[in-house]
Amino acid sequence: AANQHLCGSHLVEALYLVCGERGFFYSPKTGIVEQCCENPCSLYQLENYCN
């Protein structure tokens, strides 16, 4: 998958898809918004936010 800009609900949906039952921590403090909304990020980067 190509890198994508993911913001707001799109970012949360992508995390649900990537993390599944593991769940994830969504906090602006983790830098995920800078990494995936302001800049394009990969699914591999999203996996860093799974529990």
Swiss-Prot record:
GO terms for cellular component: extracellular space. GO terms for biological process: glucose metabolic process. Keywords: Carbohydrate metabolism, Disulfide bond, Glucose metabolism, Hormone, Secreted. The keyword DNA damage does not apply. The keyword Nucleus does not apply. It is found in: Secreted. Gene3D superfamilies: Insulin-like. Insulin decreases blood glucose concentration. It increases cell permeability to monosaccharides, amino acids and fatty acids. It accelerates glycolysis, the pentose phosphate cycle, and glycogen synthesis in liver. Belongs to the insulin family. This is Insulin. The lineage of its organism: Eukaryota, Metazoa, Chordata, Craniata, Vertebrata.
